[in-house]
Amino acid sequence: MNKLTKQLANLYEPKWNELKQQLDAKGIKVQAPFMLGVALEHNNQGGYVDESWWTDADLKVMVFGQEALNWPIPVSDDGIQIQSDDFVELYQRFYSDNYKGDYFLKDSDNHLAKNKFFSMGFNGIMSGIKDFVLDKQYPDKKAAYLWNNISKLSVGGRYGVSKEIHELEEKYFHVIPQEIEILKPDVLIFLTGPEIGRAHV
């Protein structure tokens, strides 16, 4: 695991374990937590090893959605308990398959990639920065874009988590400041509604 991704996994592991204990104690079921990773696989090179797309970018942009609805749960074939590394790899797999530098695939087999958040929101931002900023003013510069979410939890379906779950997340899994410190994005963009609390960031 590469440097930044390892730092993220080390950040998530103890916090997720503590949050999971709280959720289990209350009988609350959630989907997989949304954990970032920036080591991608390109051209079937064998594993998620390339962080250079992010670290070498001249402009690093982190784009926030509200919450990851229908974020899948990684499956363990051998019965070993799922760890934060597995959740990070889940993100890296999605990104490796769907993020193409200047755009997200809109015709991917992954249902999340067909979401308007990517096809219109995220792709629109990338296109605007490329067409009106980089191509015109800084043609020799390269941008990289990273998807994040204000809330890291989902219960599946089309609805967000309850107030109780948000409060537990804020208390035990408040990781966005550390994510920003580790990844050092130059720009933060929020594609969220006005009802989202500022306490998460």
Where are these regions (language model features)?
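A polyanion-binding, active-site-adjacent surface
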Residues: 2-183, 187
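Flexible loop residues that form catalytic
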Residues: 193
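Conserved small/polar residues in nucleotide/adenosyl-binding loops
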Residues: 199-201
